[in-house]
């Protein structure tokens, strides 16, 4: 099968639209709500999940025929835990402030429903390259929602993006006030719900 055959393209693109892990399958909601108060940690978390999902898929796909069925979940968890540890150490070394913001949520990637679901449903049944594409697609789909929600919450809640002030002081002089509710966890849930609503209204409008 060609590297970029029609089937492989669908494997990559499906998680970005109709079969989106958060919008379509409603997986990974907890971390999506927890790390989106600001855009920067949302981007880092999204990239971390993408990298870990992609490489965990590849590793499990390579060794899938040697894994005893009774311990396959344990093996998957060990592989993911090893990758999460590596990513966590890299973040602490090169982006310490972000790693502090993300706190325990990087470690909780180990139990992320999206990741474990792709390992069990796809990587265990497919070759390494399609598994890699599936991991990247699902990771990017997850990251996309984190970026949308994180950007909206930071912009309307703080008037900034990536820590840089976006709204000019003139707005505040005219009486504009940042929406403090956007910094509350409940708003993340509401925003994710709105995005899910728009997604389903678009893709399921014929039904």
Q: Where are these predicted regions, by residue range?
A:
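N-terminal membrane topogenic signal
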Residues: 12-23
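C-terminal transmembrane helix-loop-helix hairpin of multi-pass membrane proteins
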Residues: 10, 130-207
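Cytoplasmic-side transmembrane-helix entry/capping segments in multi-pass membrane proteins
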Residues: 67-80, 101-107, 134
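C-terminal ends of transmembrane helices
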Residues: 56-69, 116-126, 200
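Transmembrane alpha-helix boundary signature
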Residues: 86-101
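Structural signature of hydrophobic alpha-helical transmembrane segments
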Residues: 39-55, 75, 99-110, 186
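Short amphipathic alpha-helical coupling elements at transmembrane boundaries
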Residues: 14, 61-65, 69, 130-138
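Hydrophobic core segments of alpha-helical transmembrane domains in multi-pass membrane transport
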Residues: 29-33, 49-54, 81-88, 110-114, ...
């Amino acid at each position: 099968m060609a590297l970029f055959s029609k089937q492989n393209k669908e494997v990559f693109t499906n998680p970005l639209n109709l079969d989106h892990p958060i919008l379509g399958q409603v997986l990974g909601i907890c971390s999506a709500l927890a790390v989106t108060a600001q855009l920067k940690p949302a981007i880092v978390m999204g990239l971390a999940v993408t990298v870990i999902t992609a490489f965990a898929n590849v590793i499990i796909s390579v060794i899938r025929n040697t894994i005893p069925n009774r311990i396959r979940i344990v093996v998957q968890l060990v592989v993911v835990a090893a990758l999460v540890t590596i990513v966590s150490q890299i973040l602490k070394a090169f982006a310490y402030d972000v790693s502090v913001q993300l706190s325990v949520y990087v470690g909780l990637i180990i139990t992320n429903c999206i990741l474990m679901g792709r390992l069990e449903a796809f990587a265990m049944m497919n070759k390494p390259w399609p598994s890699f594409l599936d991991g990247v697609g699902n990771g990017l789909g997850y990251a996309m929602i984190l970026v949308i929600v994180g950007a909206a919450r930071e912009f309307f809640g703080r008037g900034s993006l990536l820590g840089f002030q976006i709204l000019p002081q003139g707005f505040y002089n005219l009486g504009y006030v940042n929406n403090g509710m956007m910094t509350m966890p409940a708003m993340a849930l509401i925003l994710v719900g709105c995005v899910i609503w728009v997604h389903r209204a678009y893709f399921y409008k014929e039904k």
